[in-house]
């Protein structure tokens, strides 16, 4: 046929058997990739430290999605929450990966079968004997089946009625675990951070899908609507399917980047807005304040801060700090976190407590400025020593650590004080191992950033695909350059399959 590469899909027009075949093969490729990627990630994943080296620091992409749906154990004897297990059961990480690979193989065989046996009776119109698909009926069947799956997921899997539940955590990502979730039928169900909304919305959407599917199975579209929306043309199906996919991609890009109950920070890492708003810093200060109110010393109050919470309050975990073209996991950037050094408190020679101004998200370098409780600049690390008035040396700044590995240690040496002031710009201070992975010290994004970028990019691409194919199917006669009612010698362009023998000819 000699088709150019961008026209090859012409071969499955008016050929329902092979159209089905290529879609089954596509499913085989997707499932095969998912299973293979899961096995690769399991081969390189280190589960030994879920607090300072969680899956999102290691650049895991498919493991978080399995985990949020209730998979926590491995046949290797470890659990994602830490510790060891003896009986992980069939639905472990490896079990899910294997199921995808087996499913991929079956789809591969089914695709070959449908490619060879393409001319099935079921695809033929009994009145004409020609290949024909009842597209509105197929739409009803698919809508009904997807409604059943959606309802089943919400009513059984998420609620724990028949399934494990989903990953649920507190607002600060400290206590996450898989547990059943009750549907939230009140207004709270519309809060994107309430897990109950996941159950209730799937139940509601599934019910709607079942009813809509039954409607489209039992009611035929009016002739004017059928012709106006070109419901008999397979390209109409392509256009509307692309619309559904790009809409879903835009939605999940939003829920991932801005955060929601479906994208827990324990599995995908914190969002950039939690750094921008000082979300974890405020909670840490609240806990320290509560400890001091109970007559704890500063050292005791800071020592009670969970290392996990302190680690979230570190700019290296901000997904917006990694450039789009910096390949690799976060651990390949600033290194593997080994331990929290503690919280540094800076004071000038007059005893005032000073706070280091933190680096905003989109800065690579930022001046080191220390302010007092009223926001007045009291010290800095000057660019030009000759004009400095607030240098660490001139102001006599000291630093003392509370909590962490350096608890109770203080420094007055200006070089050391400046070193920790620079590091305090980046949030809580951690010891990072850059030798093991030969980390280069340049921040990387988390899977949250990659997922968002990928889905937003493809959503935009698919949006144009929807416009393109929608325009082609709606204005097919215009693009072909003929009037469909014109009795021309050869109706060139009215038939989409090259070499179609049914093209009407007229002898002049």
Swiss-Prot record:
Bilayer topology: Multi-pass membrane protein
Keywords: Chlorophyll, Chloroplast, Chromophore, Membrane, Photosynthesis, Photosystem II, Plastid, Thylakoid, Transmembrane, Transmembrane helix
One GO cellular component term: photosystem II
GO biological process, any: photosynthetic electron transport in photosystem II
Keyword Hydrolase on entry: no
Keyword Thylakoid appears in the UniProt entry: yes
Co-factor note (free text): Binds multiple chlorophylls. PSII binds additional chlorophylls, carotenoids and specific lipids.
Subcellular compartments: Plastid, Chloroplast thylakoid membrane
InterPro entries, per database record: PS_antenna-like, PS_II_antenna-like_sf, PSII_PsbB
Oligomer status and interactors: PSII is composed of 1 copy each of membrane proteins PsbA, PsbB, PsbC, PsbD, PsbE, PsbF, PsbH, PsbI, PsbJ, PsbK, PsbL, PsbM, PsbT, PsbX, PsbY, PsbZ, Psb30/Ycf12, at least 3 peripheral proteins of the oxygen-evolving complex and a large number of cofactors. It forms dimeric complexes.
Similarity annotation: Belongs to the PsbB/PsbC family. PsbB subfamily.
Purpose: One of the components of the core complex of photosystem II (PSII). It binds chlorophyll and helps catalyze the primary light-induced photochemical processes of PSII. PSII is a light-driven water:plastoquinone oxidoreductase, using light energy to abstract electrons from H(2)O, generating O(2) and a proton gradient subsequently used for ATP formation.
Protein name: Photosystem II CP47 reaction center protein
Organism lineage: Eukaryota, Viridiplantae, Streptophyta, Embryophyta, Tracheophyta
Gene name in the database record: psbB
């Amino acid at each position: 046929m000699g088709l150019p590469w961008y026209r090859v899909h012409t071969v499955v027009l008016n050929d329902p058997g092979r159209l089905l075949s290529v879609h089954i093969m596509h499913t085989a490729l997707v499932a095969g990739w998912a299973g293979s990627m899961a096995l690769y990630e399991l081969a390189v994943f280190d589960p030994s430290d879920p607090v300072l080296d969680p899956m999102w620091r290691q650049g895991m992409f498919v493991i978080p999605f399995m985990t949020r749906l209730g998979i926590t154990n491995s046949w290797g004897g470890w659990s994602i929450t830490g510790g060891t297990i003896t009986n992980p059961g069939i639905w472990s990480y490896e079990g899910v990966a294997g199921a995808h690979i087996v499913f991929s193989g079956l789809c591969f065989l089914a695709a070959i079968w449908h490619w060879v046996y393409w001319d099935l009776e079921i695809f033929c119109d009994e009145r004409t004997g020609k290949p024909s698909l009842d597209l509105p009926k197929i739409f009803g069947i698919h809508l009904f089946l997807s409604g059943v799956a959606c309802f089943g997921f919400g009513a059984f899997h998420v609620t724990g009625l028949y399934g494990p539940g989903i990953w649920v955590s507190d607002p600060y990502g400290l206590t996450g675990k898989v547990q059943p979730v009750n549907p939230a039928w009140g207004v709270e169900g519309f809060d994107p951070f309430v897990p109950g909304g996941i159950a209730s919305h799937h139940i509601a959407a599934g019910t709607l899908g079942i009813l809509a599917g039954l409607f489209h199975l039992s009611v035929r579209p009016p002739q004017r609507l059928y012709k106006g929306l070109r419901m008999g043309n397979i390209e109409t199906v392509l256009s509307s399917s692309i619309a559904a996919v790009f809409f879903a991609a835009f939605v999940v890009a939003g829920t991932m980047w801005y955060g929601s109950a479906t994208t827990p920070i324990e599995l995908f890492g914190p969002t950039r807005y939690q750094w921008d708003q000082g979300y974890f810093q405020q909670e840490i200060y609240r806990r320290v304040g509560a400890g001091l109110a109970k007559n704890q010393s500063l050292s005791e109050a800071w020592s009670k801060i969970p290392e996990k919470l302190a680690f979230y309050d570190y700019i290296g975990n901000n997904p917006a700090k990694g450039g789009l073209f910096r390949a690799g996991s976060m651990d390949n950037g600033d290194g593997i976190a080994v331990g929290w050094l503690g919280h540094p408190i800076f004071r000038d020679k007059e005893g005032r407590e000073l706070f280091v101004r933190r680096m905003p998200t989109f800065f690579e370098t930022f001046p080191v400025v220390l302010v007092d409780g009223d926001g007045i600049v009291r010290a800095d690390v000057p660019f030009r020593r000759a004009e400095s008035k607030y240098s660490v040396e001139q102001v006599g700044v000291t630093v003392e650590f509370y909590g962490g590995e350096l608890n109770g240690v203080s420094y007055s040496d200006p070089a050391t004080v400046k070193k920790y002031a620079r590091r305090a710009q980046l949030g809580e201070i951690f010891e990072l191992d850059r030798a093991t992975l030969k980390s280069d010290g340049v921040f990387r994004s988390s899977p949250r950033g990659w997922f968002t970028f990928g889905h937003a990019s493809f959503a935009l691409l698919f949006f144009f695909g929807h416009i393109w194919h929608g325009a082609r199917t709606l204005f097919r006669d215009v693009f072909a350059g003929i009037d469909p009612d014109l009795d021309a010698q050869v109706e060139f362009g009215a038939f989409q399959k090259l070499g179609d023998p049914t093209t009407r000819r007229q002898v002049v």
